[in-house]
Amino acid sequence: MSLRGHHNSTNVLVETASFLVVRLGVSYVALPADGVRGVLTREEAGNEQAVTAAGTIYQPVDLAQRLSVVADLSGLEMRTVLYSNGHSYGAIRVEQVVALTDVERKDCLPLPPQFQCDERNWFGGMMLYQDQLVLLVNPSWVLGELAEVVLASVGQAEQMVAATPAAVGESC
């Protein structure tokens, strides 16, 4: 407040990214929130592997197996995250949905040098959420689209690998 009783303020545009933070065992990962189409309880998802919601079939994605982590998906907090990037649809079972959070882009960190080769396709970066290290997963990898690179012919694979950094994007 100035001496004349007026407020002096400036509006600062802060870029943020929204993520759904989930837990699998002791690991925390985040999915870009713009791809989340729904979060279902065990009863809502049913016992089938694929989940149909609003006329769309979401194929099962075993993220715990893909990350090689042990997760107890029999608990009361287990949820199925319906996720899509516009052309692939996955039903991702997680041990717990932790939060939907907005993160300032400056708080999204690049992967350390220990992450090499394939891991750089799996994760786009990392962040801290309530003192937990959270890895930002690449939606194309989660939905199995990057696995198609392995199945492609050598010439096509080189083109796909060259395009991968753009698919992964920045840390956020």
Set out the residue ranges of the language-model regions.
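An acidic, low-aromatic, low-complexity terminal/linker signal
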Residues: M1-C172
